[in-house]
């Protein structure tokens, strides 16, 4: 897959990004290089290769040490909401800005 300069300009227009011709040309080259790399990776035969559960498992047999999932901070909602001008049921009340 390869993009044309018109594709880059159209994408920039749709994203509401102002782009010069030089920037569009540079972006086109970068995107086409990226798509070329993706095509090369997709061309590699990976049948019979087991997917990795984690990138480190390819390098060495390593167990990832994870900490226990415990609460480390107390609930301080009331402390944080005390200086607020208006709260209700744990939520901050703000003025309506959209009709």
From Swiss-Prot:
Subunit note: Heterotrimer of A, B and C subunits.
UniProt keyword terms in alphabetical order: ATP-binding, Ligase, Nucleotide-binding, Protein biosynthesis
Role this protein plays: Allows the formation of correctly charged Asn-tRNA(Asn) or Gln-tRNA(Gln) through the transamidation of misacylated Asp-tRNA(Asn) or Glu-tRNA(Gln) in organisms which lack either or both of asparaginyl-tRNA or glutaminyl-tRNA synthetases. The reaction takes place in the presence of glutamine and ATP through an activated phospho-Asp-tRNA(Asn) or phospho-Glu-tRNA(Gln).
Enzyme Commission number: 6.3.5.-
Entry keyword Protein biosynthesis: yes
Family designation: Belongs to the GatC family.
One annotated GO molecular function: glutaminyl-tRNA synthase (glutamine-hydrolyzing) activity
Catalytic activity reported: L-glutamyl-tRNA(Gln) + L-glutamine + ATP + H2O = L-glutaminyl-tRNA(Gln) + L-glutamate + ADP + phosphate + H(+); L-aspartyl-tRNA(Asn) + L-glutamine + ATP + H2O = L-asparaginyl-tRNA(Asn) + L-glutamate + ADP + phosphate + 2 H(+)
Name of the protein in question: Aspartyl/glutamyl-tRNA(Asn/Gln) amidotransferase subunit C
């Amino acid at each position: 897959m390869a993009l044309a300069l018109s594709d880059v300009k159209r994408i920039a227009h749709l994203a509401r990004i102002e782009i010069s011709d030089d920037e569009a040309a540079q972006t086109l080259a970068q995107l086409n290089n990226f798509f070329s790399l993706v095509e090369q990776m997709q061309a590699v035969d990976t049948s019979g290769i087991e997917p990795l559960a984690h990138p480190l498992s390819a390098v060495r047999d390593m167990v990832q040490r994870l900490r226990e999932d415990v609460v480390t901070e107390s609930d301080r909602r009331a402390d944080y909401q005390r200086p607020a001008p208006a709260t209700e049921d744990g939520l901050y009340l703000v003025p309506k800005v959209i009709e």
